[in-house]
Amino acid sequence: MKQIKYIDNNQQKGIKIDWNFIFREYKKLKCPSNIYDPTTFPINVVNWGVILSDRSEGKTSAWLLICLLLYKHYQIQTGYIRQTDDMTKSTKTRELFNVAEEFGYVQKIFGKEWNSIYLWQKHFYLCNRDENGKVIDKCDDDFCMVLSVQKSYDYKSSLTKPRMDLLIFDEMISDKYSPNEFILLCQLISTVRRKKLSTKVICLSNMVTPYSEYLDEMGLRSVARKAKAGDREIVNTILGMPIFFEILDGNLKKSADEVHANLSYFGFANKQLSSITGSDWEIKNYPHLPRQEEGEVRTIVTRDLYIYCFDEYICMEIWKSSKMGYYINFRPYPLTVPEKGIIFSDQIPSRKNEVYGTGKGTKFVKIWDLWRQHRDFYSSNEMGHMVDSFLQSLDYTR
């Protein structure tokens, strides 16, 4: 264990971590070269990081090895965070350190002191097991605790972890979010951090979409929309706080054999398989309005319906076709705030022509029934993603 020093010699500011040393210790583990390398993270420059990739990059396992190294050398604990309390159940987290155990990293890091890990009531402890797997000795102190954003306010009065300095928020991007979930996450981080300046927040996800509440709140949405696999940069928020953002490119580390193996099983011309083969991110294809057929008559019913989401307006055109019947066409609205019509919003209405969610009443039900009946078209796949994300935030399904 290294000699403990504090930032500015002030214990309240937290332990002064030599991250270069920790990263050198990680390199000594000689992890496979084709998985994510956490030592490329600019940890001396930022306190927040967002790292996105497909499932095969080993992001979580790599940061959990950093977690073990921090505990060995500084007795620093880690908070492993998930969205909901259900996601933190032992049935879903007990295999979290399987890679560290099965590939011998626990013994590489701790030598003869410890050879295994066990989970007890959302706390991970180091231990020794005999040849039959029975725990014969265990550490009194936990090195990692499983936390949930959902229970943020409960932790305010019950959680005291002055040495918890690494927070790993796993699977941060999902299909559904709780109201004000980002605020709850920040509240949880504040409870853990207290007055420390040593805390690092690492956000990981196996889903890559710019339409996430978290990316929006972090000010990363516009960056994420333009980013492609392999991009990495430090982005400053409006208030000047730096955040590291990276989309890993799995292809850079895939060998010719791996690429060939993927194609031998998933060599189909379907873009939604891209994240499996590693050729690109998964792209959902949305229906685009077909070309008008000969003899078909299309009449616009209304252009006065809009969706407000991600600080943008989407126009919902309702058309009537002599061959297809009624349908909705979603397209960008290039102007500022629509002065007339109806605006559907996931925020508390602030204008006379704005309604929350999908609205109430027979008229609104008929409008959204077209969507439920798959009578919906989109000017682009990006437009489809935006509408999908808006409706998912309202828990509105077909």
Give names to the regions the model predicted.
Residues K2-R398:
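Phosphate/NTP-binding elements of NTP-utilizing enzymes
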